[in-house]
C-alpha cells in the first residue's frame, strides 16, 4: 500500500500522522517540548529539542504502521507554527534559541515602526501586521539589544527551515512562512528591499523563497536509518499552520471562514489575491501564489487553557494521570457541568 505522513511543527509539540491514500489515520505520535520563559516577555524553544521531537515522532509512526517491503511512503509534508526566528553564524551554528511568535520582547520596536509611519508602508507590501511576533520586529530587537549576536549572524531561519537544513543541508523557505515574516513582499514574491534596509540584512542572509509544493529528496542517511524510511523519500516543504488549517477544513471557497484555536487562535478566509487593510489590522499570508489567507489573530487560545491547568488545577491534573485520561478532557468535562450564565 501507499501512505503519506503529515507533520505539524507546533508551539508546544510536534505531531506526525501516517495516513493511507483514503485519508484514514494509520498511526500518530506527538512529542512535546518546553516553552522557555526565563525572562519577562521571553518565549523561546530549543531547536535541537524540536528536531529530536520530529525524529522521534516520525520513527514512532513508521514503526506503528508496520509497513511491509512493498509498502511505500509517497511523501512527508509539513505545516509549521509561523513567525519563528533563529540566528546562525557562518558555520550554521545556532546563536539563539527559537524566538517564537509568542515572544514579546520586540514590542518597543514594533511600536516605533507604527509611530513612524514606516510600519504601515512595510505592512502594505508584506501583509504582516506590525507586531512583536513578526521576525521583522525581532530582528530590530536583536540589532539594538543583542548586538554581539546580531553582528555574528550570517543566516536567519525559522524552525521549519532549520529542520530541512538539518535533514538536507538546504536553505529554503516556503512563501507561506515567508509571508509571515514582515520581510517578504507578497506582490512580487521576494524579500522586500525596504524591510531589508531597516533591519540591516542582505538577501543572502535569508532563505531562498520556494513554493509550498517544493520537494526535497536525498535526506541524511543517518536520520533516514533512524526513522526507518528510504533516503530518497520525498519531503514537501508545505506551509504555515494557519493557512493550511483553512485548506484542511475545506474553508477555501468565497465567503467561508475558518476559526481555529490552538496555542493561539484566529479567524481566516481565503482569497485569490492579497488583501491589505488600510489600518493594518489584518494579516494576509500565502497558501500558495494563487491563494491568500486573510484574517485576524488572538495570541491567547489553548495557551490560556494550559496555564490554567498547570497553575490552578493540580489536583485534577493528578486525578487524570491516575485515571489514565487526558487532563484537558477531564477539565472540559468539569467545565461542561457549569450552568449557562454562571458569570465565569
Where do the PLM segments sit?
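N-terminal glycine/serine-rich phosphate-binding loop of ATP-dependent small-molecule kinases
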Residues: 1-96, 124, 152, 224-225, ...
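Glycine-rich phosphate-binding loops at beta-strand->alpha-helix junctions
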Residues: 13, 211-219, 239, 265
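A glycine- and small-aliphatic-rich helix-loop capping segment at beta-alpha/alpha-beta transitions
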Residues: 19-26, 88-98, 145-147, 252, ...
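Residue-level signal for inorganic ion chemistry
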Residues: 23, 46, 76, 103, ...
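Short beta-alpha connecting loops at secondary-structure transitions
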Residues: 38-41, 96-99, 285-295
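Short beta-strand-loop/turn "lid" adjacent to the catalytic site in phosphate-handling enzymes
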Residues: 65-101, 129-135, 164-185, 208-211, ...
Amino acid at each position: 500500500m501507499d501512505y503519506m505522513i503529515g507533520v505539524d511543527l507546533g508551539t508546544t509539540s510536534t505531531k506526525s500522522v501516517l495516513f493511507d491514500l483514503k485519508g484514514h489515520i494509520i498511526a500518530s505520535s506527538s512529542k512535546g517540548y518546553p516553552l522557555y520563559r526565563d525572562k519577562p516577555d521571553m518565549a523561546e524553544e530549543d531547536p535541537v529539542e524540536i528536531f529530536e521531537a520530529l525524529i522521534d515522532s516520525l520513527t514512532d509512526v513508521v514503526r506503528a504502521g508496520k509497513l511491509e517491503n512493498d509498502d511505500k511512503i509517497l511523501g512527508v509534508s509539513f505545516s509549521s507554527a509561523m513567525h519563528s526566528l533563529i540566528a546562525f553564524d557562518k558555520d550554521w551554528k545556532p546563536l539563539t534559541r527559537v524566538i517564537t511568535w509568542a515572544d514579546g520582547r520586540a514590542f518597543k520596536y514594533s511600536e516605533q515602526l507604527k509611530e513612524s509611519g514606516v510600519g504601515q508602508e512595510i505592512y502594505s507590501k508584506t501583509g504582516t501586521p506590525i507586531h512583536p511576533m513578526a521576525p521583522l520586529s525581532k530582528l530590530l530587537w536583536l540589532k539594538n539589544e543583542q548586538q554581539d549576536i546580531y553582528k555574528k549572524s550570517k543566516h536567519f531561519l525559522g524552525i521549519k527551515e532549520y529542520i530541512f537544513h538539518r535533514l538536507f543541508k538546504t536553505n529554503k523557505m516556503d512563501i507561506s512562512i515567508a509571508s509571515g515574516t514582515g520581510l517578504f513582499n507578497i506582490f512580487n514574491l521576494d524579500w522586500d528591499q525596504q524591510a531589508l534596509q531597516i533591519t540591516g540584512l542582505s538577501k543572502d542572509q535569508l532563505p531562498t523563497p520556494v513554493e509550498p509544493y517544493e520537494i526535497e529528496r536525498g535526506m541524511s542517511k543517518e536520520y533516514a536509518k533512524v526513522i526507518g524510511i528510504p533516503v530518497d523519500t520525498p519531503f514537501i516543504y508545505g506551509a504555515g499552520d494557519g493557512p493550511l488549517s483553512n485548506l484542511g477544513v475545506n474553508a477555501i471557497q468565497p465567503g467561508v471562514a475558518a476559526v481555529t484555536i490552538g496555542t493561539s487562535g484566529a479567524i481566516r478566509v481565503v482569497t485569490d489575491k492579497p488583501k491589505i487593510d488600510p489600518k493594518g489590522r489584518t494579516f494576509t499570508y500565502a497558501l500558495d501564489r494563487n491563494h491568500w489567507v486573510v484574517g485576524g489573530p488572538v495570541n491567547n487560545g489553548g495557551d490560556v487553557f494550559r496555564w490554567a491547568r498547570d497553575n490552578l488545577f493540580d489536583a485534577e491534573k493528578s486525578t487524570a494521570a491516575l485515571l489514565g485520561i487526558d487532563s484537558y478532557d477531564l477539565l472540559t468535562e468539569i467545565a461542561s457541568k457549569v450552568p449557562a450564565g454562571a458569570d465565569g
